[in-house]
């Protein structure tokens, strides 16, 4: 028997739970400079476009990118996240396909740029889904088109005997905790972001299957893509052995 690990991951679960608070938590004023730099980075790599965002969510990056004149298409599994995007100014400018980005193809291609940010690639539950995603991305790119990914570099020292409980922040009367279980064989971390406050207890699932940059590069090679850039952040910071995140660019050869 070949162990498969726990793959009961619903692609819509994260977004359906978090949609009401996502922008309040992650689309905050202090993050605006980083969004602006990320949009600049993407703008300079989109060529003649169009662009496709995997896991477009509430449009945190897609909307400012579209506002700068790029045609942006998105895929997302969560109807509630997409409803948030639709309600925003410019929301009707971004076409969104509802579905799993490892499986569905978006209309409007081939794309000059496909991108996936904020660790969203790791939402795919296992290596097979991640390999399929790379293959679909490669098939949807124009010759010379680019695939950009922003993701964390795994750090398994975070876990003590396969678990971690972390106080994330105190927000007024509300305490934010993160409770995680780590499976190093399948490279999975199942987490629950818990909020404890006057309104009661909130629980938000965040389940990921992480991969090191070297494994992502191998997925790229399997899909016929070549790594052309790797930075530690959107500002072009050098990527080193101590970097905790990366912005990587793979290219479909001409
Ligand atoms: C962390 S949010 C990022 C949203 C947006 N890209 C941003 O930067 O704010 C992850 C998004 O990916 C979506 N998602 C997660 N797994 C997915 C999958 N397998 N297929 C499609 N969308 C998925 C979620 O619904 C959510 O909207």
Q: What is each of the regions a protein language model found here?
A:
Residues 1-57:
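Conserved class I S-adenosyl-L-methionine
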Residues 112-128:
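A short SAM/SAH-binding and catalytic strip from SAM-dependent methyltransferases
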Residues 148-219:
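SAM-dependent methyltransferase
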Residues 211-254:
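C-terminal lobe and adjacent flexible extensions of AdoMet/dcAdoMet transferase-like proteins
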